[in-house]
Amino acid sequence: MKFVQIVDFETDRFDEMQAVAEEADKRMAGRAGGPTHRLVLRDRNKPGHVLVVIEFDSYEDAMSNSNDPETGKFAQQMAALCTRPPSFTDCDVLDMTEFK
């Protein structure tokens, strides 16, 4: 079953976060069990509020990714750029539909 983690945070340093994420993407490219998709959303009514939806093939892949030291380093770098600590919501994907 596919698994999604939603990361909810606030920042006034989004450009710096993007640079950190791009560098991490390069380091972790091609790694087995990593995320399959990422969607980054900015609240139109509260621009510093950001949600990141990260999809994995399974819960087990997500936990393996979470336990990787490289992921821990990335998470610490990102948290340092937040104006409030991130919160995490773990979700099993029950249905997914594309409307194209």
Regions inferred by a protein language model and the residue ranges of each:
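Short S/T/G/P-rich N-terminal loop/turn motif that feeds into the first structured element of a domain
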Residues: 1-72, 76, 81-100
